[in-house]
């Protein structure tokens, strides 16, 4: 750890404290994540070390680069490139952002590009939210942070500071207890983020797993064997769920054009096997006039 000097604490992530720090060798500013593990006394599990080492191979313009992994005194530190703005802060500080459909389109395109890259390397995110989409103020390049960490460390119910980990972007198959989820869970999260960029408010802000599910079902309809084969066999599906019918998304996200609504419908498909892939979403007609994207 001697190579890095902490400058200031910049936040508390899902897994531990995040510092702005300086690389004493290159003088570069970096983000240093100190990972807090449940079994502090046992040190860092070798599985986590293996998973994290694989992430150093992931290099793409829309992914926050993991530059180094430091294992010292039973603690794990992850060294990332430093970006000081995230999509949540950006949306909160720019009320006019929603009035800029071109910017929303460019951000969405970059999110999907980063995800398609990760999925092509068989890496899931599982915890995508506006707070871990980082933005370079100079170029408006958007980069995904924390990819692959869920697999290495699991997703806690609460952070180490006892904050509740948000459910607002969690896919219905996870909420229904599926153990066999895959890449579609990330596409669902992106659909929620897309709607939030346009509406300037979260689409499904549930405060418990059941509240989250019911918010989803009230808008998209309660699934059944016809609309989602196999859904009634998922561990947490109950035949007693209220049977809501689906609403038209153009009424839910009124400021989005028809091509955008079509793409959103495909991303928010309840049945994960019918949900559009990130790769196919990039080819959607919504992006036909995209022009140059950083």
Swiss-Prot record:
InterPro entries: CDK, Kinase-like_dom_sf, Prot_kinase_dom, Protein_kinase_ATP_BS, Ser/Thr_kinase_AS. It is an enzyme of class 2 (transferase). The keyword Transcription regulation does not apply. The active site is at 127 (proton acceptor). Phosphorylation at Thr-14 or Tyr-15 inactivates the enzyme, while phosphorylation at Thr-161 activates it. It comes from the Eukaryota. Its EC number is 2.7.11.22, 2.7.11.23. GO terms for cellular component: cyclin-dependent protein kinase holoenzyme complex; cytoplasm; nucleus. Transmembrane segments: none annotated. GO terms for molecular function: ATP binding; cyclin binding; cyclin-dependent protein serine/threonine kinase activity; protein serine kinase activity; RNA polymerase II CTD heptapeptide repeat kinase activity. Residues 4-287 form the Protein kinase domain. Coiled coil: none annotated. Keywords: ATP-binding, Cell cycle, Cell division, Kinase, Mitosis, Nucleotide-binding, Phosphoprotein, Serine/threonine-protein kinase, Transferase. The modification Phosphothreonine is found at residues 14, 161. Pfam families: Pkinase. ATP binds at residues 10-18, 33. The modification Phosphotyrosine is found at residue 15. It catalyses: L-seryl-[protein] + ATP = O-phospho-L-seryl-[protein] + ADP + H(+); L-threonyl-[protein] + ATP = O-phospho-L-threonyl-[protein] + ADP + H(+); [DNA-directed RNA polymerase] + ATP = phospho-[DNA-directed RNA polymerase] + ADP + H(+). One of its GO terms (biological process) is regulation of meiotic cell cycle. Plays a key role in the control of the eukaryotic cell cycle. Component of the kinase complex that phosphorylates the repetitive C-terminus of RNA polymerase II. Belongs to the protein kinase superfamily. CMGC Ser/Thr protein kinase family. CDC2/CDKX subfamily. This is Cell division control protein 2 homolog. It comes from Oxybasis rubra (Red goosefoot). The gene is CDC2.
